[in-house]
Amino acid sequence: MHILLSNDDGIHAPGIQQLAEALRTLAFVQIVAPDRDRSGVSNSLTLDAPLRMQTHPNGDIAILSGTPTDCVYLGVNALMRPGPDIVVSGINAGPNLGDDVIYSGTVAAAMEGRHLGYPALAVSLNGTRHFATAAAVTCRLLRALTSTPLRTGKILNVNVPDLPLSSLKGYKVTRCGSRHPASEVIRQTDPRGREMLWIGPPAGSFDAGADTDFDAVNRGYVSLTPLQVDLTASAALPVLSDWLGDTEGLGSW
């Protein structure tokens, strides 16, 4: 098995390095990751400038100023030969639960892998201590996927409680919960007297029901949430069609 491994915390982050070490006991692993922290950049691609790479002595490749999506795109289409069998993103230092998946570069890297036709996992730890737990969980999932392929055509978003491996209660299949809308803005003044604005932390959970990713992780379970590239709100299509049929004033051609 050949694994393309990326993240959004940067190539030197402990999460990706510990995950690479664990995965290399199972398969060939090629890291292609940003050279710095690119958290929160979602699915952005760099289209207004060339991208340069730096190959480390161990073969890991850093994309200078690249986004997670850049890294997976370049890894699949130019840098990894033979190509990957699966794309893995993580381990993120912090969860990607509920609305987090909209902004997450970790999820975006997996999304790009799936968009390019590969199975893909995004792995996040609900904290910053037990990366070894998340790495072990990822290895177990990959062994299971190898023996029994998951033919959903979806991205698997994995959130792991920040606990010792022996303290995990198991796995739960979940849906994305949701957070309250974030509103905090932190105002500061730089040394030259100019105002600076920092976007504050995410808000707390709003929908954390029994079948959500929030609830599973809070109760000590690994959360497994299938995600998809297609953002069409299928249930809203007939509502929109009825609205269009009943609406006047849009004009005709």
Curated annotation (Swiss-Prot):
Gene Ontology molecular-function annotations: 3'-nucleotidase activity; 5'-nucleotidase activity; exopolyphosphatase activity; metal ion binding; nucleotide binding
Known catalytic reactions: a ribonucleoside 5'-phosphate + H2O = a ribonucleoside + phosphate; a ribonucleoside 3'-phosphate + H2O = a ribonucleoside + phosphate; [phosphate](n) + H2O = [phosphate](n-1) + phosphate + H(+)
SUPFAM superfamilies for the chain: SurE-like
Cysteine-cysteine disulfides: none
Record flagged with keyword Hydrolase: yes
Family: Belongs to the SurE nucleotidase family.
Protein name: 5'/3'-nucleotidase SurE
Native source organism of the sequence: Sodalis glossinidius (strain morsitans)
